[in-house]
């Protein structure tokens, strides 16, 4: 309190100095009355020690969100609400977009890529919370190109240093199969094609697990194998009415896109089922093919663990067996094997190798032939190559004497 002054309103002596911008004021701390007010500076000499402040720094102009960023933030929130995601997911996706927008590689990108960033942030949030959402579903909602979306997704994950777990295959099956329009009768859906959702989902899960155990899923996009498994599950529940329906027509009835490799995955899955069917006693008498084996998928899935062990053998075990075979060949010849004593036509078929399809049918690669080396006989023979042919000490001594005689003959001048 300077000089014992008091507040003229309340009479309090609790006066404090308060610097309001460039003015120094004396204010009562009890009632807030301004007792004295400083004088504004009017001369340049009084402002000699002050610093100028730019307009953008004083008003916070640079901290404002641009129109494009505001539009994309609204799109992030709208996309989360369309997908019916929880509020925490929406907040996380918005924060990821704000971080991604600060990256130079994203801010300077094309408009097509910036529009994809919205879906990438939502997909990252769903993957981190184990929410079943596919990249194809996001691309369909945003009308985005799948290649651009996948490359942008990987770039954002790498630049932000995020830990994104892979989507659980069972959750993906449930989410993807729920989009099939096969569970309610409609004018475009015949009654014989309508199926119970729970039955088809449970059988599809078993078929996808079988495909995973037999290396059909590893390193491949999951949607084609899920589409093929769903088609087989749907056919096997009522085979008499549905065996004539093709995969393309099935996808058209279900109102889903047919993935390009789905037909190949279907043939691979049918080949596995045929191999398993050959191990069941009551199916060995039947001549099953890739069409008739669909009728017995229920029995094959019921005993799939045992049938996979019987129908296939591990590729690593096969290699070890081949290495151990020369060691025990003498003992096998003495004891004899009853299998090889049977006639050739009655021998049981050896189990197939349980290996990925890329190893069972490797792609053809062009091999360049090495250039043919023409040997004329006039090539120089090095000393190291000659030493390889000298076996005994006597040969070494004879070779040294021959070399000495040759040098002596070369040093003798020719007679006149």
From Swiss-Prot:
CDD domains: CYCLIN_BRF2
Stored InterPro entries: BRF2-like_C (IPR054078), Cyclin-like_sf (IPR036915), TFIIB (IPR000812), Znf_TFIIB (IPR013137)
Region entry Required for the formation of a ternary complex with DNA and TBP, spans: 354-360
Cited Gene3D superfamilies: 2.20.25.10, Cyclin-like
UniProt keyword list: Activator, Metal-binding, Nucleus, Oxidation, Phosphoprotein, Repeat, Transcription, Transcription regulation, Zinc, Zinc-finger
Segments forming TFIIB-type zinc fingers: 3-36
Region entry Interaction with target DNA, spans: 108-114
Region (Required for interaction with TBP and formation of a ternary complex with DNA and TBP): 362-416
Residues bearing the modification Cysteine sulfenic acid (-SOH): 358
Binding residues for Zn(2+): 7, 10, 28, 31
GO biological process, any: transcription preinitiation complex assembly
Region (Disordered): 317-385
GO molecular function, one term: RNA polymerase II general transcription initiation factor activity
The keyword Zinc-finger is assigned to this record: yes
Per-repeat ranges for Sequence: 72-157, 173-249
Major localization listed first in the record, in broad terms: nucleus
Subcellular location: Nucleus
PANTHER family for the chain: TRANSCRIPTION FACTOR IIIB 50 KDA SUBUNIT, TRANSCRIPTION INITIATION FACTOR IIB-RELATED
Subunit structure: Component of TFIIIB complexes. The TFIIIB complex has two activities, alpha and beta. The TFIIIB-alpha activity complex is composed of TBP, BDP1, and a complex containing both BRF2 and at least four stably associated proteins; this complex inhibits the transcription by pol III via its phosphorylation by CK2; YY1 facilitates the TFIIIB-alpha complex formation. Interacts with TBP; this interaction promotes recruitment of BRF2 to TATA box-containing promoters.
Function: General activator of RNA polymerase III transcription. Factor exclusively required for RNA polymerase III transcription of genes with promoter elements upstream of the initiation sites. Contributes to the regulation of gene expression; functions as activator in the absence of oxidative stress. Down-regulates expression of target genes in response to oxidative stress. Overexpression protects cells against apoptosis in response to oxidative stress.
Name of protein: Transcription factor IIIB 50 kDa subunit
Protein's organism: Rattus norvegicus
Lineage: Eukaryota, Metazoa, Chordata, Craniata, Vertebrata
């Amino acid at each position: 309190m300077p000089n014992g002054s008091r507040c003229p309103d309340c009479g309090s002596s609790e006066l404090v100095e308060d610097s309001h911008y460039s003015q120094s004021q004396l204010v009562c701390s009890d009632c807030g009355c301004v007792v004295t007010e400083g004088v504004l500076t009017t001369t340049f000499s009084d402002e000699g020690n002050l610093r100028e402040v730019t307009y953008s720094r004083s008003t916070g102009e640079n901290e404002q969100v641009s129109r494009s960023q505001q539009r994309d933030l609204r799109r992030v929130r709208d996309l989360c609400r369309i997908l019916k995601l929880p509020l925490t997911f929406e907040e996380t996706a918005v924060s990821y977009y704000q971080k991604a927008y600060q990256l130079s590689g994203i801010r300077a990108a094309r408009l097509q890529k910036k529009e994809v960033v919205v879906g990438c942030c939502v997909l990252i949030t769903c993957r981190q919370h184990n929410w079943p959402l596919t990249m194809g579903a996001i691309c369909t909602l945003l009308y985005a190109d799948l290649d651009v979306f996948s490359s942008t997704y990987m770039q954002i994950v790498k630049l932000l240093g995020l830990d994104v777990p892979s989507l659980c295959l069972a959750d993906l099956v449930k989410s993807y199969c729920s989009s099939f329009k096969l569970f309610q009768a409609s004018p475009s859906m015949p009654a014989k094609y309508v199926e119970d959702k729970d039955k088809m989902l449970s059988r599809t899960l078993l078929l996808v697990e079988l495909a995973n155990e037999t290396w059909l899923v590893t390193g491949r996009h999951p949607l084609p194998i899920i589409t093929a498994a769903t088609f087989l599950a749907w056919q096997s529940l009522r085979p008499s009415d549905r065996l004539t329906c093709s995969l393309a027509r099935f996808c058209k009835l279900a109102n889903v896109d047919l993935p390009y490799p789905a037909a190949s995955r279907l043939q691979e899955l049918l080949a596995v089922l045929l191999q398993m069917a050959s191990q069941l006693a009551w199916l060995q008498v039947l001549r099953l093919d890739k069409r008739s084996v669909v009728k017995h998928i229920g029995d094959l899935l019921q005993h799939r663990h045992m049938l996979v062990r019987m129908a296939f053998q591990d590729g690593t075990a096969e290699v070890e067996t081949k290495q151990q075979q020369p060691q025990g060949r003498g003992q096998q010849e003495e004891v004899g094997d009853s299998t090889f004593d049977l006639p050739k036509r009655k021998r049981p078929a050896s189990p197939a190798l349980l290996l990925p399809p890329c190893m069972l049918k490797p792609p053809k690669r062009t091999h360049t032939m090495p250039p043919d080396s023409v040997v004329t006989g006039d090539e120089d023979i090095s000393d190291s190559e000659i030493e390889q042919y000298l076996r005994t000490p006597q040969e070494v001594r004879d070779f040294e004497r021959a070399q000495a005689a040759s040098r002596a003959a070369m040093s003798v001048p020719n007679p006149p």
